[in-house]
From Swiss-Prot:
Family: Belongs to the thymidine/pyrimidine-nucleoside phosphorylase family.
Gene Ontology terms: biological process: pyrimidine nucleobase metabolic process; thymidine metabolic process
Function recorded in the entry: The enzymes which catalyze the reversible phosphorolysis of pyrimidine nucleosides are involved in the degradation of these compounds and in their utilization as carbon and energy sources, or in the rescue of pyrimidine bases for nucleotide synthesis.
Keyword Transferase set for record: yes
Superkingdom of the source species: Bacteria
One Pfam family from the record: Glycos_transf_3
Molecular function per GO: 1,4-alpha-oligoglucan phosphorylase activity; thymidine phosphorylase activity
Protein name as annotated: Thymidine phosphorylase
Matches recorded under InterPro entries: Glycosyl_Trfase_fam3 (IPR000312), Glycosyl_Trfase_fam3_N_dom (IPR017459), Glycosyl_Trfase_fam3_N_dom_sf (IPR036320), Nuc_phospho_transferase (IPR035902), PYNP-like_C_sf (IPR036566), PYNP_C (IPR013102), Pyrmidine_PPas_bac/euk (IPR018090), Pyrmidine_PPase_CS (IPR017872)
Pathway(s): Pyrimidine metabolism; dTMP biosynthesis via salvage pathway; dTMP from thymine: step 1/2
Record lineage: Bacteria, Pseudomonadati, Pseudomonadota, Gammaproteobacteria, Alteromonadales
Subunit and partners: Homodimer.
Species this chain originates from: Shewanella pealeana (strain ATCC 700345 / ANG-SQ1)
Length: 443
C-alpha cells in the first residue's frame, strides 16, 4: 500500500519512483482517489526533477492500461497494425493520405486522432468538414471499417486512456505541459492503447512546431523512440520541418481537398510528398511490409498511381457515414467561404522566412480553429496557395489566398499573413523536409 503524498515527496526530492508506485498513482488518477492538488504536485515535481527512461515507460504503460486497450486478434487481420502520430503543425494533412496509403500496402491503421490545439490544425476537424463522416463511431463500427477498408481515422473514445484525460487537463491549468517525460507518456499512452505493432512518430521542428527549439524537438523524439520501444511497440521518430506551411494550404475543408488531390494525382505538393513518403515508408518497414525504405517507396508510389489509396480513402469515408462518391465529387460536398481573395507582398524579393505559428493563428482568427475548447468551427475558411520559402515574390503576385466569411475577418488575416511571411533580398538556404530519423538503434 502506497501513499500519494509519499510518492510526491520522493519525486520532489529527485528520487526514482518504482513501477509499482507509478501504477498506484495512475490508478488513483483514474478512480479519483488521488486529488487534483496531488496530481498537480506530482506534475510539478516531474517538471523540475524529470523521470528516467524506466519511470517514463512505467508511466506510459500504466496510463495506457488505465482504460481499454484495443485488441485486434479476434478480427484475424492478415497484416500488421501500424500508425503515425504528429506533434502537430500548420497545413499538416499527412494522416489523410498516409492512412489509406499504408492500408493499400497491406497494413491496418486504426488511427485515433485529436482536434486542433492552439495554432495547430486537428485531423478530426478536417474530417468533420465532410458531411456525414462520424468521428465518434461505436467500437463495432470502428473495428468493421478497420477490417474492411484497412484504415479508420476517428476520435478518442471515452474508455481509452482516462488517466491521460484527467492528468492533461490539470497539467494544462498548472503550467506543467512542457515536461518531456509527461508529453511522452501523454502521446504514447493514447497511441499504444490502439494495440499497435509499429508506430512512426513525426516530431516537428521550426516556427510552427510545438517544441520551441531543434534541441527540444530532438530530445522529445529520442524520448518517444526509447519509451515506445521499451513498451513493446516498434517505433521510429522523424524530425521534420515546420518552418513553413507543410501543404499548400491551411484550413479544414481546404486541406481535405488537397489530400484528395494528392491521392488522385491531381496535385502533389513536393514538400508534403517527401514527409508523407518518409513516414509511410518507415511504417511499412517497421511493420514488415517492406524490407527497406526504397522497396517501401516503390509500393507507396504504386498505390498512389494506380488509384488504390484514393479508393481506400473513399471506402473509409463512406464506411463512417460520408458520401459514397466523395473522392470523385468532393467539391460538391465541401463548403466554400464567402470571400476568396489574394494577399500581395509590399515589395519584391524572396520569401525568406515564415512565422508558421502566426499563419496557423490567422486560420484560428478566421474561424477555422478554436480559441477555447468547444468552440464551433467554420470549415470553409483558411489560407490556400501559400508561397514556399525561396519563391521569388513581386507585388503583382499573390503570396497566399485568404478564404474568409467577412471583410473584417479578411482584413485581419491579410495583416497577419503579410507580417508572417518575410520578404528578403536574397534567396534563403533550402532546409531539408526531413532532418533525421531516430531509430531504436540510434539511442
Amino acid at each position: 500500500m502506497f501513499l500519494a503524498q509519499e510518492i510526491i515527496r520522493k519525486k520532489r526530492n529527485a528520487e526514482t519512483l518504482s513501477t509499482e508506485e507509478i501504477q498506484f498513482f495512475v490508478k488513483g488518477i483514474t478512480n479519483n482517489t488521488v486529488s487534483e492538488g496531488q496530481i498537480a504536485a506530482l506534475g510539478m515535481a516531474v517538471y523540475f526533477n524529470d523521470m528516467n527512461m524506466d519511470e517514463r515507460i512505467a508511466l506510459t504503460t500504466a496510463m495506457r492500461d488505465s482504460g481499454t486497450v484495443l485488441n485486434w486478434q479476434s478480427l484475424d487481420l492478415n497484416g500488421p497494425i501500424i500508425d503515425k502520430h504528429s506533434t502537430g503543425g500548420v497545413g499538416d494533412v499527412i494522416s489523410l493520405m498516409l492512412g489509406p496509403m499504408a492500408a493499400a500496402c497491406g497494413g491496418y491503421v486504426p488511427m485515433i486522432s485529436g482536434r486542433g490545439l492552439g495554432h495547430t490544425g486537428g485531423t478530426l476537424d478536417k474530417f468533420d468538414a465532410i458531411p456525414g463522416y462520424n468521428t465518434e463511431p461505436d467500437s463495432a463500427l470502428f473495428r468493421k471499417v478497420v477490417k474492411e477498408a484497412g484504415v479508420a481515422i476517428i476520435g478518442q473514445t471515452g474508455d481509452l486512456v482516462p488517466a491521460d484525460k484527467r492528468f492533461y487537463s490539470i497539467r494544462d491549468n498548472t503550467a506543467t505541459v512542457e515536461s518531456i517525460s509527461l508529453i511522452t507518456a501523454s502521446i504514447l499512452s493514447k497511441k499504444l492503447a490502439a494495440g499497435l505493432d509499429a508506430l512512426a512518430m513525426d516530431v516537428k521542428v521550426g516556427t510552427g512546431a510545438f517544441m520551441p527549439t531543434y534541441e527540444a524537438s530532438e530530445e522529445l523524439a529520442r524520448s518517444i523512440t526509447a519509451v515506445a520501444n521499451g513498451a513493446g511497440t516498434k517505433t521510429t521518430a522523424l524530425l521534420t520541418d515546420m518552418n513553413q506551411v507543410l501543404a499548400s494550404c491551411a484550413g479544414n475543408a481546404l486541406e481535405v481537398k488537397e489530400a484528395v488531390d494528392f491521392m488522385t494525382g491531381a496535385y502533389r505538393n513536393p514538400r508534403l510528398y517527401e514527409v508523407t513518403m518518409g513516414l509511410c515508408a518507415e511504417m511499412l518497414v517497421l511493420g514488415g511490409l517492406a524490407s527497406n525504405e526504397s522497396e517501401a517507396r516503390v509500393k507507396l508510389n504504386t498505390v498512389l498511381d494506380n488509384g488504390k489509396a484514393a479508393e481506400i480513402f473513399g471506402r473509409m469515408v463512406s464506411g463512417l457515414g460520408g458520401p459514397a462518391d466523395f473522392v470523385e465529387n468532393y467539391s460538391k460536398y465541401l463548403p466554400d467561404s464567402q470571400i476568396i481573395r489574394p494577399v500581395y507582398a509590399d515589395r519584391s524579393g524572396f520569401a525568406s522566412a515564415m512565422d508558421t505559428r502566426e499563419l496557423g493563428l490567422a486560420v484560428v482568427t478566421l474561424g477555422g480553429g478554436r480559441r477555447k475548447p468547444g468552440d464551433a468551427l467554420d470549415y470553409s475558411v483558411g489560407l490556400s496557395k501559400v508561397c514556399a520559402l525561396g519563391d521569388e515574390i513581386n507585388p503583382e503576385q499573390p503570396i497566399a489566398f485568404i478564404h474568409a466569411q467577412s471583410e473584417s475577418a479578411f482584413a485581419e488575416a491579410e495583416a497577419a499573413v503579410k507580417k508572417a511571411i518575410h520578404i528578403g533580398d536574397s534567396k534563403p538556404e533550402k532546409t531539408p523536409e526531413i532532418y533525421r530519423y531516430i531509430r531504436e538503434s540510434d539511442l
